[in-house]
Amino acid sequence: MAVPLLTKKVVKKRSAKFIRPQSDRRITVKESWRRPKGIDSRVRRKFKGVTLMPNVGYGSDKKTRHYLPNGFKKFVVHNTSELELLMMHNRTYCAEIAHNVSTKKRKAIVERASQLDVVVTNRLARLRSQEDE
């Protein structure tokens, strides 16, 4: 099992959900964020008690950005040949098997990953053990 190269603790500062202003009042206004541009907009003018706007202060530490809590960066893998790319970077990146990969290929990917000493985050997904009767 590869040990992550990252020694710094991964800390997510804040996880505010930025929703579009007035999306809670009107059905036609969806929740996905849009920057308010109106001349009288309370959100744009940053009044107290209104929807928060995303800004630089919500970003995480540059050194730990995109890292998972296990200390690795995620790399989506569809087959064993894509897994070979992680051979030299197994202390920085971990593999995540894509959702549309069959059980047969999943077994091959997990087996090859153990040979290459690459961490697989979802190694048990869709792999069931069958009992012989």
Swiss-Prot record:
<dbReference type="GO" id="GO:0005829">
    <property type="term" value="C:cytosol"/>
</dbReference>
<dbReference type="GO" id="GO:0005730">
    <property type="term" value="C:nucleolus"/>
</dbReference>
<protein>
    <recommendedName>
        <fullName>Large ribosomal subunit protein eL32z</fullName>
    </recommendedName>
</protein>
<dbReference type="GO" id="GO:0003735">
    <property type="term" value="F:structural constituent of ribosome"/>
</dbReference>
<dbReference type="InterPro" id="IPR018263">
    <property type="entry name" value="Ribosomal_eL32_CS"/>
</dbReference>
<dbReference type="InterPro" id="IPR001515">
    <property type="entry name" value="Ribosomal_eL32"/>
</dbReference>
<keyword id="KW-0687">Ribonucleoprotein</keyword>
<comment type="similarity">
    <text>Belongs to the eukaryotic ribosomal protein eL32 family.</text>
</comment>
<dbReference type="GO" id="GO:0022625">
    <property type="term" value="C:cytosolic large ribosomal subunit"/>
</dbReference>
<dbReference type="GO" id="GO:0003729">
    <property type="term" value="F:mRNA binding"/>
</dbReference>
<keyword id="KW-0689">Ribosomal protein</keyword>
<dbReference type="Pfam" id="PF01655">
    <property type="entry name" value="Ribosomal_L32e"/>
</dbReference>
<dbReference type="GO" id="GO:0022626">
    <property type="term" value="C:cytosolic ribosome"/>
</dbReference>
<dbReference type="GO" id="GO:0006412">
    <property type="term" value="P:translation"/>
</dbReference>
<dbReference type="InterPro" id="IPR036351">
    <property type="entry name" value="Ribosomal_eL32_sf"/>
</dbReference>
